[in-house]
Amino acid sequence: MEVRFLLFLLLLVLVINPSLVVNMVFGYMFGLLLRNNYSRLKAMIRSNQTEEEEERHEAVDVSNPFEDVDIDVMQHLKTLGLDSKVDEEDVEYFRRFWQSMLRNK
């Protein structure tokens, strides 16, 4: 077909039904968002955990927060003087810092 004929048909559709074009633009934007966040959306759908289970899983034992820490990390904490006692505020700070690092990967 000729390009002018196709453009004329598109113009005719725009004049008759402009909501179709608006729907097409919104669909395109939704598709872009879905394509960029598809892996996160898949993980959310496959996950059957509730928010309470996630919070329980992420809870840190304040009595011994260094239970699963590597040796080199412990040595670095000793040089900073943080190996013996950690306040709850520090644990919250470390948790927020770790979450921000995970988000910015």
Swiss-Prot record:
Protein name: Protein U4
Organism: Faba bean necrotic yellows virus (isolate Egyptian EV1-93) (FBNYV)
Family: Belongs to the nanovirus U4 protein family.
Residues annotated as transmembrane: 5-25
Upper classification of the organism: Viruses, Monodnaviria, Shotokuvirae, Cressdnaviricota, Arfiviricetes
Highest taxon in the source lineage: Viruses
GO cellular component term of the entry, any: membrane
Membrane topology, as annotated: Single-pass membrane protein
Subcellular locations according to the entry: Membrane
Keywords: Membrane, Transmembrane, Transmembrane helix
